[in-house]
Amino acid sequence: MSIWVDADACPVVIKDMLYRAARRTNTTLTLVANSFLRVPPSPLIRAIQVPAGFDAADDLIAERVAAGDLVITADIPLAAAVLAKNAQALDPRGNWYTPGTIEERLRMRSMLDQLRGSGVDTGGPSAFSQRDSKSFAGELDRWLSRQRPQPDASAPQSADEPPTE
């Protein structure tokens, strides 16, 4: 299992969390962006710079993501492509994209695009907050803990481990 990041619009605080989590859990982390990214030196962390172009980073992630991987993105069409490949998608604010919600999110995005195209000011998302950061951290930690192999209940217990039931 790997974590992929649509990194062009990903907040720095989220990237920093992901770097620490990758090292702590020995998880491969790949950041994809149209611009150069400086990432910490680690065999687990890599950055891929794609040529400038509409959806180039999204297309690469959608092509390479595998079932069971996690993708961090605020891009709804990318999240839909990720879910179609049986991977999971989480936005930088800690909200999961799910098969049950993705169609509604795509419809809402399309409607807002149409309104903006006709000159209506639809505003934008609220500023990224500390609450968003905490929500993301909690969801990431829960996902990472579900990925760890569970101890085998039939395996012999060491003397300093409590018995499992």
Curated annotation (Swiss-Prot):
This is UPF0178 protein Bphyt_5655. Belongs to the UPF0178 family. Residues 115-134, 139-165 are annotated as: Disordered. InterPro entries: UPF0178. Coiled coil: none annotated. Pfam families: DUF188. It comes from the Bacteria.
